[in-house]
Structure formats: structure tokens, C-alpha cells
Amino acid sequence: RLALTKESLCAFEYSTEWLNSGFSISPFELPLRSGVFIAKPRPFDGGFGVFDDCLPDGWGLLILDRYLQRNGVNPQTLSLLDRLALVGSTGRGALEFRPDKSVVSKQEYADFEKLALEAEQILDSDNYNGEGIEEFQYRGGSPGGARPKIFTRYDGKEWLVKFRAKRDSKQIGEDEYCYSLLAKECGIEMPETRLFEDKYFGVERFDRILNGKLHVVSVAGLIGADYRLPSIDYLHIFKVCAALTHNVAEIWKVYRLMVFNYLIDNKDDHAKNFAFIYRDDDWHFAPAYDLLPSDGING
């Protein structure tokens, strides 16, 4: 159960049913016990990290706010609970929020060329508020990260497909696909990847299984790290992995990914680009994602 205090801080309590049969959705921040948890003001604007992971940021936040404006709603008037309700059942991982005020999600195969052009229009103009806004919102407006992206269904699987951002090279999709193949050759666990229409990078969603969802939490969400700042290093991730999984094989996954990021000069390896996934009644280091050479100070 979720509520807001008079200071606009998130209050959370596990239900009796979940206490009897569930697991901690965020072991360091929300251990599985009775009682009310109150969030800190920072770094998640009065929320808990595990719920902040479900909210759109970057591109997704841009799309949501313009979608709201297009429909006569001032985004500045929404509370944290309002925004979680807009995520509803469409967010990353297994968490769902009630009341569910999310828009109906389109999962059918998309016209990628048209969407890529609409993404360029949206990014090129602060005032663009055309139909492309609703199209992206209907196709999964909640994904995080800076690059335009959608969710789609193809070949019986759910995929995340990315488009080029303003500063990206024209072959960014081909580049990310090649690095995903290289990562797999290096023994790094990744979901299936492919190029749609020979230029749009797609990755199968690892938080979705047949007729179900898997719970996922980023390192930022787990330990309350501000991913916008260079606030953690790999030692923190090793410690989180050891504490959650108690499994040396999982720690080796972190090590391989650390070395790979260093060798490809990926400086976008911030706290939201690592995650843990709960499956088979245990925690595991999540498959890798966002593997590209990148500049930045927040890695």
C-alpha cells in the first residue's frame, strides 16, 4: 500500500498477504516486515528507489509531460502517486499500480521509419505537440534513458526498440547491435538482440516471460544512489551483488561487465544501467544493457 505524508513523502506498507507469501521488493530499503516505511526527500523526490525505477525519465518523461499537456493537464500539478497511477500496469518489471490510469498500450508491429521521423520532430522542437506524442505514449512511454524508444511485439516476444537521438551517429543502431554480439562472445549475459529494418536496434525484454513478469530493481533504486551524479563505483555493485545473491557466479557477471565497459570506453555505466532481477525465488544480476562507447561523468 502506498500513500503520501503531509510532507509529500512516500509511505509504504506490505499487505498481510504479501508478508505471508511474498519477498522483499527492495531488500535494503524495504525489508520484508510489518510496519510503515517513510521515504527520504532525496534522491528520489520523496519516493522509494524501487518505485522511481518504474517512472519514466529522459525521453519517457518528455513524452509523458507533452502527452499530458496535449490533453489539457499541467504536469506540474501531479503528485508522485498520480505519476505512478499513470504507469499503472505498463512499467518496467513486475510492479503494477492501482488505480491504473495508464493508456492502452499498442504492442503490434510498428512503422519504425515513421516513428524515427516523428522522434526527430519531437527532439528538434520544444513546442512540437503533434500526434507523434500520443503514438509514442501508446507504445510504452515509460521506458527510461535519453534515446527515443518503444515497446513492440515481434515473433511472439516483447521487444524494446531504440531510435536515434540528436547527438547520435546515423549508424547508432548498427553499432549497438555489434557491441551486443561482442558482449555475448565475451561471456556476458544479454537478452536476444536484433536489427529491425537493418538499422533500428532491438532487445528482447528480460523482465517479461510467457504470460508473466519478473521483478527488476536497478542498483540506483536498491541503494538510493543518484544516477545523475558519479556517486558509486564498481565496488558498490560488487557489494550489492554479494549481499543479494550470495553467489560467486553472479559476482563474476559483474566483473565481466566491468571489464567490458572499460575496454569499450563506456562511461555511461551509471547506477541505473545495472540491475538485479528476482526469479526462481532468488536474486540474480540482470542481463546487461546499454553497452556502447559513451562519454560522460556519471559512470
Predicted regions: what is each one?
Residues 1-299:
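Phosphate/dinucleotide-binding and metal-coordinating scaffold of catalytic cores
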